């Protein structure tokens, strides 16, 4: 269904190489996504080219910023229908991936897809602000998120999961640089430090701003706060 050569070409352009098995898995995942989307609202993007560019290639841009090795613990916070988590797992099946979301129906699809692809992952049904205060706190080498929350809000949800010395990769759109400017204080409060930023253009003209936040100190125990408080009074 999807154009595997297009996916391979796009990813090679940002120095991410996919082997034959990965490309076969992407084709199967695309089929699963389109089929399940008929009964469950996973995505508005269902055309083959859109899936390749806006879901698969876009998710894999994170590998420009982070380089997880075998056994590294990675968490995708707010994975939804499995993005960027499943594409990252297809490209790097040796990582220990956790995909977290608060919507059970979407996670059922994520679980079904991981099983069908012959991969392994830890699927967690929980709210990020609650999971980030429990046993998952500061246990991950990398956190990634494509969630739509503002950067300062996203950092409060994600940085508590990252161990000191680890990295949070925020996958933002065209306003990522502006959002980062408004989030620097929050990043510092949460124990982070901006490490690097890169902007990429996808073939459809979409802009992806990738921001790496290095965890340099423990997150204070009062964070993350309850979601209502995060929304009402974001760190700034």
Language-model regions: role of each:
Residues 60-149, 155-156:
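Conserved SAM/SAH cofactor-binding pocket of Class I
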Residues 106-108, 176, 180:
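Short alpha-helix immediately C-terminal to the canonical SAM-binding loop
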């Amino acid at each position: 269904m999807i154009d595997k050569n297009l996916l391979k070409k796009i990813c090679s352009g940002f120095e991410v190489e996919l082997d034959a098995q990965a490309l076969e898995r992407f084709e199967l995942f695309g089929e699963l996504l389109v089929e399940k989307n008929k009964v469950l609202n996973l995505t508005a993007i269902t055309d083959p080219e859109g899936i390749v560019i806006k879901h698969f290639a876009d998710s894999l841009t994170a590998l420009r910023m982070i380089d997880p090795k075998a056994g590294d613990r990675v968490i995708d916070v707010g994975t939804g229908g499995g993005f960027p988590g499943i594409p990252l797992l297809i490209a790097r099946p040796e990582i220990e991936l956790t995909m977290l979301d608060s919507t059970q129906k979407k996670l059922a699809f994520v679980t079904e897809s991981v099983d069908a692809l012959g991969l392994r992952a830890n699927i967690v049904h929980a709210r990020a602000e609650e999971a980030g205060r429990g046993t998952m706190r500061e246990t991950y080498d990398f956190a990634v998120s494509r969630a739509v929350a503002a950067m300062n809000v996203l950092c409060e949800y994600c940085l508590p999961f990252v161990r000191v010395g680890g990295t949070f990769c925020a996958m933002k759109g065209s306003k990522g640089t502006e959002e980062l400017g408004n989030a620097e204080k929050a990043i510092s409060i949460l124990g982070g430090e901006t490490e690097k930023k890169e902007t990429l253009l996808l073939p459809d003209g979409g802009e992806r701003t990738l921001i790496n936040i290095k965890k340099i100190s423990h997150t204070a125990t009062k964070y993350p706060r309850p979601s209502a408080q995060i929304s009402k009074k974001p760190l700034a």
